[in-house]
Regions:
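Hydrophobic, aromatic-enriched alpha-helical segments typical of multi-pass transmembrane helices
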Residues: 2-239
């Protein structure tokens, strides 16, 4: 990176802060959000009428928190791309495009969950079966799984940008990519497994990998008292 760009980088968001936000929102929108919905749980999916009878606003909480996860992921990827653009432009662009695909799919899905599902539920419409993620066969699950599959592709592609001296970050990002893409591919054969015990274990495994990767980035790349030139070589390894 040129010396001329350094003052702007000094004022920019630290990579560690963006990663910490990702970890926090992944935890809140995932395990914590899921636990809170148990205060007013939905029974196992049977039909739209049963869903409407048990609908409650708290069931939307994980999706509202999911917007925070979406935004923090965009911040993290934007920072990674900015730091690696000069030396790894092609790989950085691939990461950026895959993340944009993730953001588009998840934004549409979560908007449907927090804005359209309540409207359909209040109206008692049977169309809610085609939108709510309480139904494991709803097409919105494809947006979810393929959206996070795209994000997994982005983390996989981004792994080499962290250099050979950060092997655990690289491994966690690659593992997250493998799990995310495998989940998306599996959905091509049917989505009924998503709300079974194997689906729950897959969900917990993804969250564990994703949160661990974000925490590793936040800890390893936290601001230190280093010379300016050294501090700007975080992502200089060519992929």
């Amino acid at each position: 990176m040129s010396e001329r760009s350094l003052p702007a980088l000094d004022r920019d968001l630290p990579l560690s802060v963006a990663a910490a936000l990702v970890a926090a929102f992944a935890l809140l929108s995932g395990p914590v959000g899921f636990a809170l919905t148990l205060l007013h749980p939905q029974p196992a999916w049977t039909d739209a009428a049963t869903f409407v009878a048990h609908a409650h606003p708290i069931q939307q909480l994980p999706y509202w928190l999911g917007f925070g996860l979406l935004g923090s992921c965009l911040l993290l990827v934007a920072r990674v791309v900015a730091l690696s653009w000069e030396h790894n432009r092609t790989r950085a662009l691939v990461v950026l495009l895959l993340t944009a695909m993730y953001a588009a799919a998840i934004l549409v899905n979560y908007a449907l969950q927090v804005a359209y599902v309540p409207v359909l539920a209040r109206a008692g419409s049977p169309l809610v079966a085609y939108v709510t993620m309480a139904n494991p066969e709803a097409p919105t699950w494809l947006l979810e799984m393929f959206g996070y599959g795209a994000l997994g592709g982005a983390t996989w592609a981004a792994a080499p940008l962290f250099g050979a001296h950060r092997p655990w970050i690289r491994r966690l990002l690659v593992a997250n990519g493998v799990v995310s893409i495998a989940g998306a591919i599996t959905c091509a054969g049917g989505m009924g497994w998503l709300q079974t015990v194997p689906g729950l274990f897959a969900y917990l495994a993804w969250n564990a990998l994703f949160i661990a990767a974000a925490i590793a980035i936040a800890v390893d790349l936290r601001p230190r008292r280093t010379p300016r030139a050294a501090a700007r070589t975080l992502l200089h390894t060519r992929a």
